[in-house]
Curated annotation (Swiss-Prot):
Species whose genome carries this gene: Neisseria meningitidis serogroup C / serotype 2a (strain ATCC 700532 / DSM 15464 / FAM18)
Function: Required for accurate and efficient protein synthesis under certain stress conditions. May act as a fidelity factor of the translation reaction, by catalyzing a one-codon backward translocation of tRNAs on improperly translocated ribosomes. Back-translocation proceeds from a post-translocation (POST) complex to a pre-translocation (PRE) complex, thus giving elongation factor G a second chance to translocate the tRNAs correctly. Binds to ribosomes in a GTP-dependent manner.
Residues bound to GTP: D14, H15, G16, K17, S18, T19, N131, K132, I133, D134
Segment forming the signal sequence: none
Subcellular location, principal: membrane
Protein name: Elongation factor 4
Catalysis: reaction(s): GTP + H2O = GDP + phosphate + H(+)
EC class of the enzyme, as a word: hydrolase
Topology in the lipid bilayer: Peripheral membrane protein
Gene Ontology molecular function terms on file: GTP binding; GTPase activity; guanosine tetraphosphate binding; ribosome binding; translation elongation factor activity
A GO cellular component entry from the record: plasma membrane
EC number: 3.6.5.n1
Keywords, comma-separated and alphabetical: Cell inner membrane, Cell membrane, GTP-binding, Hydrolase, Membrane, Nucleotide-binding, Protein biosynthesis
Amino acid sequence: MKNIRNFSIIAHIDHGKSTLADRFIQYCGGLDLREMSTQVLDSMDIEKERGITIKAQTAALNYKARDGQVYQLNLIDTPGHVDFSYEVSRSLSACEGALLVVDASQGVEAQTVANCYTAIDLGVEVVPVLNKIDLPAADPERVEQEIEDIIGIDAVGAVQCSAKSGIGVEDVLEEIVAKIPAPTGDENAPLQAVIVDSWFDNYVGVVMLIRVKNGTIKLKDKVRFMSTKAETQVEQLGVFTPKSVQKQELKAGEVGFLITGVKELGQAKVGDTVTLVANPATEPLPGFQEVQSQVFAGLYPVESHDYEALRDALEKLQLNDASLKFEPEVSQALGFGFRCGFLGLLHLEIVQERLEREFDMDLITTAPTVVYEVVLKSGEKIEVENPSKLPDIGSIETILEPIITATILVPQEYVGNVMTLCNQKRGVQVNMQYMGRQVMLTYDLPMNEVVMDFFDKLKSTSRGYASLDYHFKEFQPSDLIKLDIMVNGEKVDALSLIVHRQSAVHRGRELASKMRELIPRQMFDIAVQAAIGSQIIARENVKALRKNVLAKCYGGDITRKKKLLEKQKAGKRRMKQVGNVEIPQSAFLAILQVSDK
């Protein structure tokens, strides 16, 4: 056991984490050259394209160190994006050490800081590594100083490498052996193994990635999941080198995969503890949480007969992504669809993209919303995640909205812009800290405002330099009202929004004028109105298309012309009574582009 090292790599998006992992695998001979593809551990196409890691992957590598001993290095790849922070904390809890990979030309970013604090809280040894030192813009001394200022760990003499060209990779491996402690644990104690990740395989069902903390797990053992109390039998055990290699047993300190007869991911929850039925552990390992959805959106098929296909597709995605929640919902405007819950906006985009790409679906997505707590006058408390389900204003005592604490790292010259943006979004400043050339701002922001377009705005006001990390803080009472959009006198439920009273009139006007541009002209006039309760706050008209009925009357009597015009008007009126308006997908997305000046 003293020759095992479990470690993961913490890095901001694009700081070279996956490339470094590829180099480790190549250096330790995990795959031969023929099987090396770039970003071996990022197995989904969408992960490679966006250059982000979503699911945790793993590789067990044998490394012959300079002291002549062979070490087993277990690399657990972690996602770097803020939406997947729970997956990160699970990956880190399975390790004794973490490599903090920082781009030597860009310096420290907010998500790196957040994940690094998570690691330090979990008692994981953090080893700084400077990557991309072969870039002309690299400035290792400055970045070492930044790591010390911002994160507060000793970074002088941090290992320098370039994962792309392979310089210094061996030094990094030596550093892992030297700095990261060997796992502790008792092979003879009752079994305790934490599920780091789980995914669905079409042939064997659910594959779980586990880290054995205490005890030993063997083939054909009967095991129990401690949070759901489900029991099942071990069918296969093994490790990934990234290819899967079968083993007879996994002992304390090892990381490997476990396949049982479980067919649903809901039973193998990430962070849960696995133990033996025959000799169970009394306590589960700490840190398990049920994943909560933060952002909700409606997904509707463009063709209503694709509804069942969409259900199948969502169920298949859920097999691989336990944090995706969905339930059927009916909208008058869009027909049958699903209300889905996501971890954050990136998660929503990825699910939408996977549905379109892997399952060939055509979707309409409504604007994302968050969960509100509504206290009724009767004293009852309900949760509302869909604006059209908000009860009547008369029966509501207060509405509480979710507040998040956001940590923003930004270079000094953009601080003003970022603070202005946060104030526009009703943010409350909590803290501001100068660290070298960067400033760390902490704000309490309403999640509702962040969901819309905060991330894009933040990037554009800071020219892409600001980085953001956030976590949920609490629910707070707020002056919120429901804004309805009416087309031709009918409410379109899918366009309802819950907004703050201050920005309601402005938002209503903007939305109405946006809709006027997007709804195609019909044969009759269409009124687009924004309403709060029964009060109309904005109106726009989409002008009718009309044929020139006077074209055939060269000269002639005015009464003849009047007669034709009156006849046309009467026809248009009749049309308006029976006509219905098709609202295009772009109109639903318009909600997202409305700014809050």
